[in-house]
């Protein structure tokens, strides 16, 4: 059977809805629209940054998570964890020794957090996980402010 286009439609409909709610609120009440946009930026960015921090990511990886999350949350193909993970991998470059010890380090918690390869993966996964949580909270707040003004 051919692939359904429903997941693609849903993947783009939710971000379009969020942006539309903010734009409509801006036109009816600029102050509330600003509050919505600020809420979206702070919830998505902060939660993604918290995820990167929980993974003990480099401060620039945490900053990358905060800066990219509000935009990547609106794009179904991009993820803020990719950008924070890329920053982590660029700043704290894994060595050949990290790759060689990978098969041993994945079996202990200490090794999992110490190995630079798995640390990059932790930064990616936790940034995305917490960023998704921030997207739900921020989206709910955008909807709340929208209905409060109408």
Segment roles from a protein language model:
Residues 1-150:
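Compositional signal for N-terminal targeting/processing segments
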């Amino acid at each position: 059977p051919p692939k359904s286009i429903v997941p693609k439609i849903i993947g783009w409909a939710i971000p379009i809805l969020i942006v539309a709610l903010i734009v409509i609120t801006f036109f009816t009440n600029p102050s509330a629209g600003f509050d919505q946009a600020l809420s979206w930026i702070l919830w998505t960015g902060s939660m993604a940054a918290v995820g990167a921090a929980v993974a003990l990511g480099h401060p620039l990886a945490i900053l990358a998570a905060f800066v990219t999350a509000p935009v990547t949350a609106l794009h179904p193909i991009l993820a803020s964890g990719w950008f924070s993970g890329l920053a982590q991998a660029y700043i704290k470059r894994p060595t050949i020794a990290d790759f060689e010890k990978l098969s041993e380090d994945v079996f202990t918690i200490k090794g999992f957090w110490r190995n630079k390869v798995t640390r990059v993966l932790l930064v990616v996964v936790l940034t995305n996980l917490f960023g998704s949580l921030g997207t739900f909270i921020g989206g709910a707040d955008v909807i709340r402010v929208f209905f409060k003004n109408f």
